[in-house]
Amino acid sequence: MALRMLLLLLLLWCSNPGSAENSSLPGPPYNHTNGRLPDRDTGSAVLRLFYVITGLCGLISLYFLIRAFRLKKSQRRRYGLLTNTEEHEEMASQDSEEETVFETRNLR
């Protein structure tokens, strides 16, 4: 019995006084508001924002690089006058049955 009493007194002596919200003992006044944000949270948010922006810029540049190399346009064939006078093309007229021969030697 004395051992139980000693243990009970030891526990009461080591216990913390109750908080102001849940105790019959008055505690010191406590201010729940804090005027500034903790530095650790602000720094990690800025660092996370930096990583997100860097990742987005990397993805956008990768998209444009892939688009530039995959959709490389082949050289367009330029149509103009024939340089060789031996090459003649005959085209049939749809309106009449006459044949028209196009020559390039006098067109320059």
From Swiss-Prot:
The chain crosses the membrane at residues 47-69. The keyword Glycoprotein applies. Its main location: membrane. It is a single-pass type I membrane protein. Coiled coil: none annotated. It is found in: Membrane. Glycans are attached at residue 22. The modification Phosphoserine is found at residues 93, 96. GO terms for cellular component: cytoplasm; extracellular region; membrane. Pfam families: DUF1180 (PF06679). Residues 83-108 are annotated as: Disordered. Keywords: Glycoprotein, Membrane, Phosphoprotein, Signal, Transmembrane, Transmembrane helix. Residues 1-20 form the signal peptide. Belongs to the FAM174 family. This is Protein FAM174C. It comes from Mus musculus (Mouse). The lineage of its organism: Eukaryota, Metazoa, Chordata, Craniata, Vertebrata.
